[in-house]
From Swiss-Prot:
The active site is at H11, E89. InterPro entries: His_Pase_superF_clade-1, His_PPase_superfam, PG/BPGM_mutase_AS, Phosphogly_mut1. Homodimer. Catalyzes the interconversion of 2-phosphoglycerate and 3-phosphoglycerate. This is 2,3-bisphosphoglycerate-dependent phosphoglycerate mutase. The gene is gpmA. It is an enzyme of class 5 (isomerase). Belongs to the phosphoglycerate mutase family. BPG-dependent PGAM subfamily. Keywords: Gluconeogenesis, Glycolysis, Isomerase. It comes from Pectobacterium atrosepticum (strain SCRI 1043 / ATCC BAA-672). The lineage of its organism: Bacteria, Pseudomonadati, Pseudomonadota, Gammaproteobacteria, Enterobacterales. Substrate binds at residues 10-17, 23-24, 62, 89-92, 100, 116-117, 185-186. It comes from the Bacteria. It catalyses: (2R)-2-phosphoglycerate = (2R)-3-phosphoglycerate. GO terms for biological process: gluconeogenesis; glycolytic process. The record marks H184 as: Transition state stabilizer.
Amino acid sequence: MAVTKLVLVRHGESQWNNENRFTGWYDVDLSEKGRSEAKAAGQLLKDEGFAFDFAYTSVLKRAIHTLWSVLDELDQAWLPVEKSWKLNERHYGALQGLNKAETAEKYGDEQVKQWRRGFAITPPELTRDDERFPGHDPRYASLSDKELPQTESLALTIERVVPYWTETILPRIKSGERVIVAAHGNSLRALVKYLDNMGEDEILELNIPTGVPLVYEFDENFKPIKRYYLGNADEIAAKAAAVANQGKAK
């Protein structure tokens, strides 16, 4: 029996990743490095013989453009794609746009680590009259007041990501289709926590690098049996460590 696989990829480096700023739902594009990372991710998948039947991504351009680059490298630009806000990055509330290192200097490394990586801790809320509040963005016009976040913890992110997985993505995988998901550091952490049944302390230390394909293999009951990155292990570890260090004071 063929092994069922799922590919997850965090978007390539964004302009605000490069500037070390909290991004959340702000719709910033890829940096030049990020575009190269996305292209390299597609090449890795091509080299390993991957091809897909369906793709999912968020409604934020850094993930969308990453997916486009990956599919272009695979010569699968025609692939059907579903975009959903439920795969968006975690909403960082009033931290969105702030420099992470400067915020750590003000509040301390541990507080910023908890805001970035803690399970149930939410950053300070946005007010609804703040221009950064998603209720002002037409792409979210169909969302209810309850669905429009003013801030999110990882726990709250899980509340939207996991139902989307179980109700939308997983049934397609069960039908035999080969699926790729291009999303964000925290929406993917939310999914990884669920798939691997990670504890809160364990997920605190998980950092997903930009632009590196993460492959899951499932058994006949669609339970994960293996998770691994494609690419050079030392380079991937260095990229993950760099993600962890973004929230530390200089």
